[in-house]
Amino acid sequence: MKKIFFIFFLIWTSLSVNAGVFDKKNAFLKAEQAFVFTESQQNDRLSLNWDIASGYYLYKKSLEIKGENGQLFIPQLPLAEIHQDDFFGDVEIYRHQLTFSLPFTQLSATKQVEITYQGCTEGFCYPPETRVIALTSLERESGQISSAVLKEESVLSELPLAEQDRLAAKLIESKYAVFWFFLFGLGLAFTPCVLPMLPLLSAIVIGREQRPSTAKAFGLSVVYVQGMALTYTLLGLIVAAIGLPFQVALQSPYVLLTLSAIFVLLALSMFGLFTLQLPVSLQTKLTQYSQQQKSGVFGGVFVMGMIAGLVASPCTSAPLSGALLYVAQSGDLFTGAITLYLLALGMGLPLIFITVFGNNILPKSGNWMIQVKNAFGFVLLALPIFLISRVFPEIEMPLWFSLAFAFSLWLLYQFRNNKGVWVFTFILGVMGYLYYSYAMNRHTPAHQTTSLSQFERITSYAQLQQVLSKNPNSLAMLDLYADWCVACKEFETHTFSDVAVQKAFTDVLLLQVDMTKNSEANRELMQKLHVIGLPTLIFFNQQGQEIEGSRITGFMQASPFVDWLQKMKSIQPISQ
């Protein structure tokens, strides 16, 4: 068993070490070298030119020219080439060179234009590039851009992406992104939301009067994983297509509390307090039906796999968020289904290995199984604590401490004749108590109340624009919050209440929108800001404009969040 875990550990760590296969920094040109941009203003026209390196191309649909007030200018573009893209299908592109011009009469309502474009090459895509051109001189030298603009672009280029955005970008860059989802799934298999599923599957396969054969154990585990894979595939497609309304239903406190109650019952049954079973009469009928149709047991395992997929979904981590973001950006439902299926298959592979190999390694049934069953009960109790704490964060630490204390007492009883275990457990208990005391003092309700009181509530997009216009010299952060959003509560409890974060907030305008009711004003604001789900944090500069590449669309711990804020602030002194 240890060898199996070691193999999976090597696979996951090698994936992290070799993450550079996505970048290929030495194999590709820098964006400014691949797409050499120049501009000139003469003869009452603004001329734009891109010299495109061999093997590289620009997307026609990515070209966008905006004025300082956000108005769009539509240029007359030359005929584009049709290209079969790995992710977007048939797209129009430009190779070698792109040149066009705009008359100043068309640009008379603005003093500057913002030009956005994006290019790719085989197996690699660049993030969108933006150039700002001031229209103050008709004889401006070709390619000249203000130092302030260059400085801002330099700062933005160094800005770290959020974890889910960084993952999505790497996946889109990779030609074989679909297959990488399988490896990411292996990593997700060891997250707190998936790990508790291991004893549940073991109970299905091993916890029978007669242990199933290796072939049947393999079959049960595969069917279980297929049920989980189906759930994740459908979940990903629904989230990508619907967004917020589905999040509302799935992350509702009622759903989380119901799931928690189910796992508490399962844990109590594993402690032997009672046996969960159907009435004898119904069991007899089901047994007869099962004998007539051999797939009955497998069908039940398939349904349990689907349920396991739903249980894990509220605890979506950054890699899964990146996967969903990738599906949303690809726009291809078939590709999205395949990628998320492989993600779930990777998550289920460790379950299959543990079930099959564990079935042969474990000794015959005996008293040891009672101890294992009780231990699994403690593991099952961890998941409801994890879920309940997202609805009632103030009781998270007391619940974890209570579970750890109960497990320690049980462990000491099992090894009551082993002094070494007593000493080791005592040391762990002292360390756990010290950490508990520290955590309780660090995240008190007073701290949380203070952090929330700093936010100014926004109810509409119009009000947001008005507030931003009255604070032109402040960095503003907009927090899209909802009571049903469990990750939003994590931000409040673990991030916003942190002392270092509170200190970093001193010169930041803090705004918050309550999206709980999903009202018409909420939907309008989401549409205007292009928000697909919660939590979402958006940063605005001193002009009230969103800072490009600065969004946070998933939970972030306090330390990296402080670094993020410092990066945002480093952009603010720039004046154009």
From Swiss-Prot:
Signal sequence annotation: 1-19
The answer to whether UniProt assigns keyword GTP-binding to this entry is no
Catalytic activity annotated for this protein?
Answer: [protein]-dithiol + NAD(+) = [protein]-disulfide + NADH + H(+); [protein]-dithiol + NADP(+) = [protein]-disulfide + NADPH + H(+)
InterPro entries recorded: Cyt_c_assmbl_TM_dom, DsbD_gamma, DsbDN, DsbDN_sf, Thiol_diS_interchange_DbsD, Thioredoxin-like_sf, Thioredoxin_CS, Thioredoxin_domain
Mainly localized where? membrane
Enzyme class label? oxidoreductase
On whether Transcription is a keyword of this UniProt record, the answer is no
Name of the protein: Thiol:disulfide interchange protein DsbD
Q: Which NCBIfam families match?
A: PRK00293.1 (NF001419)
Similarity field: Belongs to the thioredoxin family. DsbD subfamily.
Q: Which residues lie on this side of the membrane: Periplasmic?
A: 20-177, 251-253, 317-336, 389-394, 441-576
- Looking at the UniProt entry, the stretches that span the membrane are 178-198, 230-250, 254-274, 296-316, 337-357, 368-388, 395-415, 420-440
Which SUPFAM superfamilies does the record cross-reference, listed alphabetically? Thiol:disulfide interchange protein DsbD, N-terminal domain (DsbD-alpha) (SSF74863), Thioredoxin-like (SSF52833)
Q: How does it sit in the membrane?
A: Multi-pass membrane protein
- What is the native source organism of this protein? Pasteurella multocida (strain Pm70)
Q: Which is one Pfam family of this protein? A: DsbD_N
Q: In this UniProt entry, which cysteines form S-S bonds?
A: 120-125, 193-315, 485-488
Subcellular localization, as worded in the UniProt entry: Cell inner membrane
The EC number of this protein is 1.8.1.8
Show which residues sit on the Cytoplasmic side of the membrane.
199-229, 275-295, 358-367, 416-419
